[in-house]
Amino acid sequence: MYHNFDQLASCQESLFYSFSFLDPVDDAHTGHHIYACTSFGPDWGNLPANTTNLLLQSSDAPEPVNGTYQIGYWPAATGSSVLSSLVTLTNQLRQYLVRGLGSIDRPTILFARYGSTSVGLYIGQALDNRGIGENVLSSLSDSIASANASLAASVAMQFCEPGQTSHHVFGLIATGNGTFDSVQAALSSWSKAKCLTFPVVQNITGTLSLVKPLFNASYYATTVHPTRPPVSHATSTSSNATSVRGRALAPRTTCSTVQVVSGNCYDSLASECGITLAKFLQYNKVTDDDCSTLVIGEHFCCSAGQLPDFSPKPQSDGTCTTYTIKANDNCETIAASYSLTVDELENYNNDTWAWEGCNPLYVNNIICLSEGNAPMPASLANAECGPQVPGTLTPARGTNISTLNECPLNACCDVWGQCGTTSDFCINTGTGAPGTAKNGTNGCISNCGTAIVQSDKPATYRKVGFYEGFNLQRPCLYQDVSQIDLSAYTHIYFAFGALSSSYEVQIPNGTATGTTYEFDLFKQIVGTTRILSIGGWAFSTDPSTYMIFRDGVTSANRLTMATNIADFIKDHDLDGVNIDWEYPGASDIPGIPAASTDDGTNYLAFLAVLKNLLPDKEITIAAPASYWYLKGFPIKDMAELVDYVIYMTYDLHGQWDSHNQWSQEGCPTGACLRSDVNITETEGALSMITKAGVPSNQVVVGVTSYGRSFAMAEAGCYGPDCTYLGSADDSQATPGKCTQSAGYIANAEILAILANSSRVNENYIDIDSNTNILVYDDTQWVGWMSEGIKNSRKSVYQGLSMGGWTDWATDLQKFNDAPFTSTSWTKFTSDVILDVDPYVEGNRTGNWTSLTCSDAAVQDALYMPCSQRWSELDASNAWSDAINVWTTIDEPKLGNTEPGFTLSIMNTFHAGESMNCGSIAPNGACSTTETCAWFEGFGDSGESGPAAMLIYNSFTVINELTDKLVDQAYSQLWYAINGIAATYIDNQLSDFEDTFAPVPPAKSDEWLDILIDLLGLGLTAVAAPFFDGVFGALPALEALGEAGAQVAQDVTYSAIAYGVSIATSTLPSAAPGDWTAESQDSFSATMGSVLYGWSNATANQLYTLFNGSETSITLLTTLISDGKLIEGSGGAPSVGYQVSDSTSSDVEAFIGKAFFGYSIPTLWTISGSAAFVIDSGYPCSAQNPLTDYMTASTQESTYACYNDNLYYLVYPDGTEDGCSDQHEEKCVKKYFTAPPGLDTLSSTTWGGITLSELIEGSVNTYIANGNANGGPVADPMDALTLKDLSNQNITTPGYIRLPVCTAQVAWASWTNPAQSNSSASGYPCNPLQGVTKCSGYTYEDETTSASPSVSDCKTLMKNIAGTSGEWTTGIDGQRAIAKYGTCKFGVQNVGVTGDVTYNTGSQDIVNIVTEAISKYEWEGHVGAKGYMKCSGDAGSQKVEWGLY
C-alpha cells in the first residue's frame, strides 16, 4: 500500500490500483490508501485461472444478448492521446477478466495507469467478466480509432441502459492527463447506475454476456410512474439518517428479503423477488412509491413477515463483527446493509485501526459492525513494522498493537507500516483512533522521536586517522607513514588488510606497490594506537572476494577466520583490528548477489570469537550511516562486544544517487547537488545509531579529507535543488589529477584548485549543510570539509558525548615532498618496491659493486630461489643507484627519451652503449641474455658486479616478452597478415556485416569514437590474460604458489594499466607505432583496423617503458624487483620472440573474444537493428511467458537465465503495425524476433561469443548504472574492469551495452513511431517522446508568493512528458491547456484574426516549464510568461504562453 502517487512516480511499467471512489488520490498533499502492483505486460495472463469464478459466472447463465455500447470522448479535455497506452492496458485487463480474476459477488472494479493514461473499469456482478474481456475489450481499440477518438485525451465506453441496476452496467474510461479524479467520478456514477453523457458519441452493437437476465422495465411501465427516479445514491438528512426499516425487536416470523442496489426502483425489486409490484408494496407497507428515498443496501421483504434484524453481534472471543471496505462503499450503504445507523457505525469504530471517520472510507480497511474489541487490521504486503506486517498473530487482549513488529534499530514506524529515521517517520500526529495521522503526514506509531541519545562522556575522546597504505599506487599525492602528524591522532588505522580464500590475512598488492613497506613502517609507530583495518568497500563487494566475509562468519569458518586474524595481530604486535565489512545482509549491491539475512547474526557470533581471542586488543567495526544498510547489523549487541564503532557519516550522497527517487528528500530524480556530509543528515544518523542502543561514547564519527564532486547540469545553478549530469555509473565530474576518480577529489587537489583563482567561480560555506562548497571551471561542483569545518564538527560531536572522530584519510590532506633522503618520489617509490631502504644516503648503496662472478648466487643459480639470488647479489641497491644516476645526472643532460634512459643505465653498469631495450627484438641488441663474465669484463675493476647481469637480463626478458605479444598481435597482423588475424579475424570480417547487419550502416563520425573505445578495452582483454599467463609461469613466482599467482596478477594489472594509458596517449614522432585511428569505408573495416592499433600500442608500450619517465621507472621496478625475471632453482624464464602453436591458439581466442564481444552488439546498434534485452520479470522456471510479444520458438532461441531471472535478446523487426512497407490489405501481427546473426553464434565462430554473455554483459551494464540504460563504456583503467578482462570476462559492466527493458516498454516504443525516435540512444527501451509544435521560446519572470508551486509544475510535466499530447487552439482567447494542482499552462494567440487555429505539443510545455523553473524558481514557487512560434492552419503563428 502507498499513500500517494509520488511514491510510484519512477515506475515505467503498467500499474494496477485499488482505492476508494471517495479517496481524492490526485491530491499529493494528503495521505491516501492506494494498493498497487506492477505488471511487465503478460503478468495477468500467466497467473493460474480462477476456474471456480469462471464456473460460477457461467453456470445457469442466460444466453448472451445483443447490447448497445456507447463510445464517447471529450474533444476539449486536456492531456495526451490515450490510444497507445490504452491498447497496452486493455490487453492486460482482458487477461485479468478472461482468467476469472475479477469479482463475482460484487462489482469488478479496477484502476490502472500506463504512462500518462489513467484507466478505470467497472463491471456489474450481473455481467459475465470473461464475456466482457473476450467480446468487448478485444475490439475497444479499433472501435475508438473508428470513432475518430484516436487523438482524444479522454475516452469512455459503456453499456448503461435506463431501467437497469448497477449490476448490469459496464464502463471503461481512460484519461490522458495522468490523474484519476474524473475516472473516480465516472466509476462512481456507474456504480449508482447513472450513465455518462458524452459530447461526441457513437453507438455500436455487440454481444453482451450475462450472469443474470436484464430487467425488462417495459413490463412494469404501466404500473410504476415512468418519471419516478430510481435510487442512485444513499439519501441522508442527518448523521443518523439511515433508516432501519422494520428491525425485528423480538422473535417472530420473518420474511425473505431483497437488497437495494443502485438503479433499483420498486418494480425492479419486485422483479428480483419474483412477485408482483402490488404484493411487494403490500409486504413492505409502502404507501409512497417515490424511489428516491431508497437507500443502497437497504433490505425489503419479498414475502409476508417481519423484516429480519441484520445487525451483527460480537464474536465469541469478544471481538466485534468485522467488515472489509470495498472501493464503492460508504457509511450509509454499509449501515443500511447491516440494519445499523451511521452513528452506531461511527461509535463502534472509535478504537478501530486507521479509522478516520466516514469521509472517506479506505479500501481494504477492516472495520467493526458491532460492539466488541477492535479487530486486527488487514495485513499489508509491503508493511515492515506495526500490526499490519503479514503473518502477525492477534496478541493478548490489552496489548498495544502499535508496538508489534518494531523496526530494526528501534527506528520509527509510521502509520503505513514503513520504517525510517527522519521526521517524516518519527512524529506522532494521530487524530484519535490508533494508526491514524494528520493529513499530509506519515505519523508515527512506535519508537517515535529523533533525539540523539547521549551517554556519559568517553574516558578518552578518540582522534582516529585512516592511512591509505596503497597511496603509493597513485600517480601523485603520496604520503609515507613517517609523514603522518601523529600529534593530531590517538589512533592510526592502516587501510586495508585483506583475507585470502582460506582466511589468511594479507597486505594486498604489497611488494609491487609499496604497501608492505608502509605497513612495516606503520608497525614501528610509537605513542599512537595502531589498528589494522581489514576489508573495505572494494574487498567487500568485488565479485572475486565478496564471499570471503559472507562465508567466513558462518559457523563452519568463523573460528578459522577469527584465529587467523588474531594470530596476525599478535604476530605483528599491533594494538587491535577493525573489521570493515560493507555490508552484511545487503541485498542491492551492484554486481554481486543479494546477501543472506543471516549475515548479521553470523557476524555477531564471529565478533564474539574474535574478542575472546584478542581480549587485550582493541576490536572495532565500521558501520554505515544509512538505515538501509545498518539494519543488517545487530548493532546494539555488537556494541557490547567491540570497543567502539567507526561510524561512516560520509558518502551520504554521490553520483550513485542518480535516478534513485528515494535517495534525496525533495529531489525525485536523485540528481540534485547535495553534500555527502550534510550536518542535518549526520545528526539524524547519530540519532539512529544511539536509539538503536549504541552508547554515544562508543560512536566515533566520520569526517573527510576529500570531497564528492559533480558536473553541474547548468552553469550558475549550484544550489541544493540544482542538478548534476550523468547516470549512476557515469560521473561527468573532472577527476583529480592524482586520485583520478570522477566524483571523488582529495582535499589536497581542492586546495590546489583554490590556489588558482582563475578557476574558482564560487567558494563558500553552506550554512544549512555545514559544508564547504566549491564551484570551479564553471560547471564543476564539490562539497567538502575544510580544516575549519572539520574542527567545528569535532567540537559538536564532543559536545554530544560521542566517542571521538575519524578522518578519511591522512594522505589526502596535502601534497607532501618526498622524504628528505630521496631526490624524488620516483626514487622513493622505486626503492620501496625494490625493498631498498629509501632513507639510506650515499652515491653507492649496499655491496653490489664489490661482488664478483665467483659468488655462490652466480655459480649456484640453478639451485637457489630467484628472490634469494636477487637479494644476495644486492640487485635492488644496484637498480636504485642506477636510477639515482639517471634522475640526478643523466636525465637533465640527455632529456626524457628512450635511447637516453637505456644509455644511462648501460653506462652505469659498464655494459656498452649499443643497447636499446626500447626497440622490438631482435632490433636494439637487447634480446640476448649475457653471462656474468661479460659484465665483469667491462671496466678496470669489474665494479658493475653480477647485479648488472640480473638487471640487464631482466630487460631482455621484458623486451622479448613484449615482442612475444607483438609477434602475436603485431607481427602476425602487420607482416603479411598470414598468421592468426589473417586466418581468424580478417577472413571473418568479410562476412561480419552481412551476418549481423544485412543492411550496412551508413558511415558516421561515431565509428571513430567506437574504434577508440575498443582500442583501450580490447588491448586490455587481449594482453591481460596473456601477460597473466606469462608472469604466472615465471620460475620466481611459480615457486610461491598462491602468493606467486597473486603477485603475477598484481604485476599484470600494473603492466596493462600502463599499456592502456600509452594506447590512448599522444606519443613523440620517434615512437615505432605510427598507427592513427581513422574511419574506413565500412564499419567492419574500421573495427578491423583496431588490430593494427593493438599491435602498434604494444610496440609503443615497449618504447615508452624505457623512456625514463616516473611512471615507466615505477613499472620497470615492479617488473624486475625481487628477481621475478631471472633464472633460479625453478628454472629460467622461457621467453623468446618466436611464437609457439599453443600461444598462438591462446591469443587467437583472446583476440576473437575481445573483438567480437564488443563489435557484434555495437554493429546491431549502429546499423539500426536496435537489438535489446528483455527483462521478462519471471524466474528461470517460467515457460515461454511472453507469448504476447514473441513466438514460442523465438523465446526458446533467444533466452538466457541470469541470477534466476529470465532474459531475452531480440529486436523489433520491421514496421510497428505488422505490415510491410507496401501495407497489404491484411496484416499479420509482428513480434520481436532474434536479431540478425544471433543464430550463427557458436563455440567455433565469432570468438566463441555466447548468447548468455551478450545478455549478462548488457544486464551488468544496466545494473551498474543504477538500473538505467545509457551507462558509460567500460574504463580499462578501472580495477574491477581490469580484473574482469584479465579473466576474459567480457560481461564486465560497460563492455556490452545493449539496452535493457521490459517487453511492454519496448513494445510501446515500437508501436508508437510518432512518439519514439528509432535512431535515439537506447531504442526501443527509451521513453516515449512528446510532441513539439513550437519554437523560439522567450521567457519573462512573473514569480511571486502567489505563483504555482514548483512541485505541482513538476508533476504537470511528469504527466505529459513522453506523450503524444497536442492541443489545437483557436484565436478567441487565452486557454489553459495543461494543469495540475496550483500549476496551469496557458496559451493565447497574438495579433492574428480570422478563422485560425494553432497547435501546442506536450514537449513544448515540458521544455518551457523546465527552463522557467531553472531560471525563476523562488521559495518553492515559479511563474513566467513569454512568446513562441507555433504551427497552425495558417502557417507559423506568434503565441503568448503563461505559467500561472
UniProtKB/Swiss-Prot annotation:
GH18 domain mapped to chain residues: 461-831
Record-level GO BP terms: chitin catabolic process; polysaccharide catabolic process
Chitin-binding type-1 domain sequence ranges: 382-450
Disulfide bond annotation, renumbered to this chain: C385-C413, C407-C419, C412-C426, C444-C448
Matching Pfam families: Glyco_hydro_18 (PF00704), Hce2 (PF14856), LysM (PF01476)
Disulfide bond found in the keyword field: yes
Protein's UniProt name: Probable chitinase LysM18
